[in-house]
Amino acid sequence: MSFPKYKPSSLRTLPETLDPAEYNISPETRRAQAERLAIRAQLKREYLLQYNDPNRRGLIENPALLRWAYARTINVYPNFRPTPKNSLMGALCGFGPLIFIYYIIKTERDRKEKLIQEGKLDRTFHLSY
């Protein structure tokens, strides 16, 4: 039984298991991968020791999660790229509600003023004539 030759899709990159570069790597690259794996395993072990400590007090601080949250929330402007869509959404969200509320108040006052001038509105508690 023969299998058809794998044809890579134009929409997706080649899987690592089918990439020839995965198996033909230099010793330096292998050493760097092993060092990264060792660091990752050490950090995971430290985290699990803190997580499963029965005498734990307070929260466990994950430095990677703190860096991610800082970059995501507090440090927005160095990573922000202004586009026409961002500008339009900012203008709509900033000035849109103000213009909408102004329009509602203005039309309501104009309608009331017109009714007062025609004498159709009963003003029982008016302060001025």
UniProtKB/Swiss-Prot annotation:
Subcellular location field: Mitochondrion inner membrane
What topology does it adopt in the membrane? Single-pass membrane protein
* Modification type Phosphoserine: residues: S26
InterPro entries (UniProt xref): NADH_UbQ_OxRdtase_NDUFB4_su
Give the stretches traversing the membrane: 88-105
One Gene Ontology term from the biological process aspect of the record:
proton motive force-driven mitochondrial ATP synthesis
Q: What's a single GO MF annotation on this record?
A: NADH dehydrogenase (ubiquinone) activity
Which GO terms of the cellular component aspect does the record hold? Answer: mitochondrial inner membrane; mitochondrion; nucleoplasm; respiratory chain complex I
Domain of life the protein comes from: Eukaryota
Predominant localisation class: mitochondrion
The N-acetylserine modification is found at S2
Q: Which UniProt keywords apply?
A: Acetylation, Electron transport, Membrane, Mitochondrion, Mitochondrion inner membrane, Phosphoprotein, Respiratory chain, Transmembrane, Transmembrane helix, Transport
Kindly state the subunit structure of this protein.
Complex I is composed of 45 different subunits.
What is the role of the protein in this entry?
A: Accessory subunit of the mitochondrial membrane respiratory chain NADH dehydrogenase (Complex I), that is believed not to be involved in catalysis. Complex I functions in the transfer of electrons from NADH to the respiratory chain. The immediate electron acceptor for the enzyme is believed to be ubiquinone.
Q: Which family does the record assign?
A: Belongs to the complex I NDUFB4 subunit family.
User: What is the name of this protein?
Assistant: NADH dehydrogenase [ubiquinone] 1 beta subcomplex subunit 4
Per the UniProt record, the source organism is: Homo sapiens (Human)
